[in-house]
């Protein structure tokens, strides 16, 4: 970091970072050290140190962040270099947003660009944190991006206002409701082609937002489920639409013995010393009975579950679709 701060040729040094992933990681670690000093609320001397650090490095942070953002936004790099570069850029924008000397508008812009860069670095956790520092409403972050970065641009053609605005709104809607990803990506590419010859900032910011949208759609759960159908079962378990039970080794042995008894039509005597063991055995016997009698459902509940109004619910269900077995 000292090399960047004290060296006059800042841009040349940052350009070298894009060609050396180890350099990027080293700089990120050094920036983290600065970050903890800047956020430390202890002692007056730390507060003075904050002012001194801000005075010395905030301009360099800005140069690093915008240079990396511009290069990574306009050119293609290997994934790891791109990820590390966006991570560094996001971190710089986050540091800049802590500068109390900036206007509220500039602080918001820094937080927004930090959130977008964290997204492009596949650091969703930090991206969400930075986004929530600006607004709670899902639509507002996209609206903020549009207004902050396009309202100062002078449009020469009326189609640009309508098309860019429509594209941003569609991206926002798609990300909130998680649908029409492919259509929006195709539409965004169409707008990008129209903006190719523009040098007033439209292409730069719209490409950046499109990159973030692409990364978010690639990592969306619906996209992953389409690519890996088995994930559906996993998601259903996480959302408690399905339940998964794991047997202990001793319980598995009981299950195996019952299977053997059913297959060979022999009687097996199983001794279980605890009440819980007997409960398990009763449940397993009922389970095997249910599997051999299609259409019959049984709900096994402990006695306590039939108290405080739950008994009525259980009886009502049992009349319509199942047999309720009270367990003592």
Q: Residue locations for each model-derived region?
A:
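N-terminal helicase ATP-binding lobe
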Residues: 1-328
């Amino acid at each position: 970091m000292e090399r960047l701060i004290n060296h006059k040729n800042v841009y040349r040094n940052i350009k070298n970072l894009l060609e050396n992933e180890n350099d990027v990681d080293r700089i990120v670690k050094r920036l983290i050290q600065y970050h903890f000093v800047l956020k430390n609320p202890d002692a007056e001397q730390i507060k003075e140190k904050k002012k001194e650090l801000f005075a010395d490095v905030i301009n360099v942070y800005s140069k690093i962040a915008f240079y990396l953002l511009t290069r990574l936004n306009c050119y293609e790099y290997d994934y790891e270099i791109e990820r590390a570069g966006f991570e560094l850029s996001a971190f710089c924008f986050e540091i800049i947003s802590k500068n109390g000397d900036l206007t509220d508008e500039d602080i918001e812009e820094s937080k927004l660009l930090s959130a977008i860069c964290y997204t492009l670095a596949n650091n969703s956790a930090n991206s969400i944190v930075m986004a929530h520092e600006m607004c709670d409403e899902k639509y507002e972050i996209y609206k903020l991006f549009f207004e902050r970065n396009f309202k100062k641009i002078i449009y020469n053609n009326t189609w640009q206002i309508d098309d860019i605005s429509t594209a941003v709104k569609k991206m926002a809607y798609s990300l909130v409701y998680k649908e029409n990803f492919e259509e929006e990506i195709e539409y965004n590419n169409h707008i990008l082609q129209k903006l190719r010859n523009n040098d007033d900032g439209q292409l730069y910011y719209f490409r950046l937002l499109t990159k973030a949208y692409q990364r978010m759609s690639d990592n969306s759960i619906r996209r992953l489920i389409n690519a890996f159908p088995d994930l559906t079962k996993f998601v259903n378990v996480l959302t408690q639409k399905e339940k998964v039970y794991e047997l202990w080794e001793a319980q598995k042995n009981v299950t195996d013995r019952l299977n053997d008894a059913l297959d060979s039509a022999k009687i097996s005597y199983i001794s279980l010393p605890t009440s819980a063991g007997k409960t398990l055995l009763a449940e397993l016997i009922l389970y095997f009975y249910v599997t051999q009698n299609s259409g019959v459902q049984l709900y096994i509940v402990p006695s306590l579950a039939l108290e405080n109004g739950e008994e009525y619910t259980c009886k009502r269900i049992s009349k319509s679709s199942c047999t309720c077995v009270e367990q003592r």
